[in-house]
Structures are given as structure tokens and as C-alpha cells.
Amino acid sequence: MGKKMVVALGGNAILSNDASAHAQQQALVQTSAYLVHLIKQGHRLIVSHGNGPQVGNLLLQQQAADSEKNPAMPLDTCVAMTQGSIGYWLSNALNQELNKAGIKKQVATVLTQVVVDPADEAFKNPTKPIGPFLTEAEAKEAMQAGAIFKEDAGRGWRKVVPSPKPIDIHEAETINTLIKNDIITISCGGGGIPVVGQELKGVEAVIDKDFASEKLAELVDADALVILTGVDYVCINYGKPDEKQLTNVTVAELEEYKQAGHFAPGSMLPKIEAAIQFVESQPNKQAIITSLENLGSMSGDEIVGTVVTK
């Protein structure tokens, strides 16, 4: 019997060197062909995705057109806008590939609000860079309005926002209902729209999409969390002569490698932490970190990728 899987798409599944809408749609057609391999094997999919380049470009457009009569939209609204655009492209691409395969299934995109704690320490120390690069003078002028800017690796100054951890997903029950009715679901785009309180007030923040995907996998009681990235395996001693691929690894082993500093913050580390958190959430859970091209191996005797178990 197939598994209920949350599949978190990496940036390379959407964006190539061409940032046009057409190119991103074409990339998602190729991505959808890989996802359909899983659907053919009987798996039930909840697909999440990033939005970093897309929301960055949208913020540039908002800034360029900002005026009294046409004010720029806030970050939470921009995240919602990219959830809509990428969700539209992805659902369209999935429908194309399902039709080619002769599979009759519905696809639904869910605008997803992810609840964060207003007392999260991340709000005291914004670290996530967003938007365009500015000169120091431009950044200092912008900071007078209350924004926080930091110098970014010699490339200029960028606005930084908090990256709080998700504590709940408002639409989780809706997503689970769709899955129970065998509807392929796209949700938690860009880590979700960050909201706080019972009134679900949007806040200026960015939620890591791997942590949001993990929280979603917990809430819908998924069997597996599949995190896609640009490499086939998680490695220790990455880029060194003694580099080693991890195939089957336990949470305890991953924790040791993490403490030894094998995983880079902002790159592989959040994927590792999300995988550990999901596998520890309940018995018999599995996390897989691999590349898009290896999705077809998920039901084989040997999964190509790093399989994390308790």
C-alpha cells in the first residue's frame, strides 16, 4: 500500500537561469513528471515548495513601483502572492502529467497560513536576508523607518527579517480532508504565510520551508517526509577527500554529525533538523533527503538518498 508523503521541493525544482514565468512553468512540468512516478506507485502526496527567488523578485517589483498611490505590499502578502502563482503553475503542470499518464486525480492548491509564536527569539534577532542589495547610505536611510539591514558578504546591504519556527498550520485539517479524499495537495508554499494570534495577523517574517513541511507532515500524520535538494545524499566531510555519503542513518547518528559541525547553517542544517524532528515525532516515521531525479526510487528495494529512521 502506498504511503502518505509530504514532498518538499527545493529551489532547483522551480527556477533555472531563466526567471521568466514561462521558464518556471516548464521547470515545474519536468518536476511534475517525477512526482507522477510516486503517484503511479500509489503514494498520496502533499507537495510543499520554496519561494525565495520568486518572493525576492516580487519585492524588487514592489519597491520599484512604490508610491503614495500605489504602495508596496507587505512581506506576508507577497508570500501569499507567490503561493498563488507557484501553486497555479504547479497544479497546472501536475494536471498535464497526470493526463499524459492516464491518471484521473484532482489537484488542489491551498493558501496556507502558518502560526508562529510572537515571543519566538527569532523576532529579537532577525537574520533572514530578503529583497534587493542596497548601498550603505541607502540602507541607513531605510533604517530610519524601523527596518533592520545588515551587510551581506561584501555584496551590499540587505533587509533582514525574523525566521521563527512554525507551531501550527491553520489549514492542516482542510489539507488532511483533501488527502483523505485522494486529492493531491499543494500547500505551505514558501514556508507558509506567517501569522500570529487567534486573529491570524500577518507578520513580517520568513518561515523555513523545511520546518514548515515537517510541521505539516506531523499534523497530517504523514508516513514519510521527503526533502528534495540539489544532491543525491547527505554527506559528512562534504567537499573533502574523505567525503562520505550517508545512506541509512539513525537520528542518534545524525545528532552526532550535527554536533560535530558537518552541516552548514542555512543550507543542509535545517533539512537535517527537520528530518530529525519528524522521525522523533511518532513511531515508525521516515525522512528521506535526496534529489528530485531520485523520486522514482522511493518504492524500490533501495532508495537512492539518505534515509533517516529512529
Curated annotation (Swiss-Prot):
Pathways per UniProt: Metabolic intermediate metabolism; carbamoyl phosphate degradation; CO(2) and NH(3) from carbamoyl phosphate: step 1/1
Keyword list, A-Z: Arginine metabolism, ATP-binding, Cytoplasm, Kinase, Nucleotide-binding, Transferase
Enzyme nomenclature, EC number: 2.7.2.2
Localization per Swiss-Prot or TrEMBL: Cytoplasm
Induction statement: By arginine.
Consequence recorded when altering E138A: No change in activity
Annotated consequence of substituting D210A: Almost no activity
A Pfam family per the record: AA_kinase
Consequence of changing E136A: No change in activity
InterPro entries per record: AceGlu_kinase-like_sf, Asp/Glu/Uridylate_kinase, Carb_kinase
Complex and partners: Homodimer (predominantly) and homotetramer.
Stated name of the protein: Carbamate kinase 1
Biological classification of the source: Bacteria, Bacillati, Bacillota, Bacilli, Lactobacillales
